Amino acid sequence: SQNNIFNFFKKMLTKSRNIFVIKISIIILNSLNLEYNIELLEIIKILALCSEFTLLGVLFIKTLKNIDINKEIYELAKKVYTWGKMACIFYLEANSNEIKDWILNESTEENILYNFVAITYSDKADIRKRLKKISFKKNEFSKISFLIYSLLFLDAEKGIMFLDYKEELLINYLERAKIWLKQN
């Protein structure tokens, strides 16, 4: 029965020492199309703190019903690093200024991965809109500059050349850079 399957794989999450058994357990539990279960969610969130399981944890969270999925992913993203953070940000909806600011701030913290995440971070931090502003918060322009650099550094098919609005982005960046240099 589905209940037996659920109980078996839930037990495997906490008892197994084999990474692949744990991953398979998360995937199978995810496929059961479960209602919100706080005990299981807490187990998955603990496992997701390890970057080995973060992506599967996020995918599990995304299928749950009756919870604020974006809030759960955002809270997890603030606790993980490198690959785990990248997985969270990829699935995180940047639907508030708080989240957009956080993504912008995190973009330079994860600089070992900038080749992979520059477009995602730039989009979700909304640097296109930010570059239309007159003034910036402390360090905001430096972080935007890092993302612009990262976009320029990437291969043409992955970086700024991929963006439909690259000219607008670069023109706005150069205009803001002139103003920023005069002020600092």
Predicted stretch roles:
Residues 94-132:
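Eukaryotic acidic, Ser/Thr-rich intrinsically disordered low-complexity regions
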Residues 1-2, 122-184:
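Long internal repeat-built scaffold domains in very large eukaryotic proteins
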Residues 32-37, 67-73, 98-104, 114-115, ...:
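Flexible loop/turn segments at the boundaries of HEAT repeats in alpha-solenoid HEAT proteins
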Residues 1-37, 43-48:
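Alpha-solenoid helical-repeat scaffolds
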Residues 1, 20-34, 54-65, 85-95, ...:
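Structural detector for internal amphipathic alpha-helices that build alpha-solenoid repeat scaffolds
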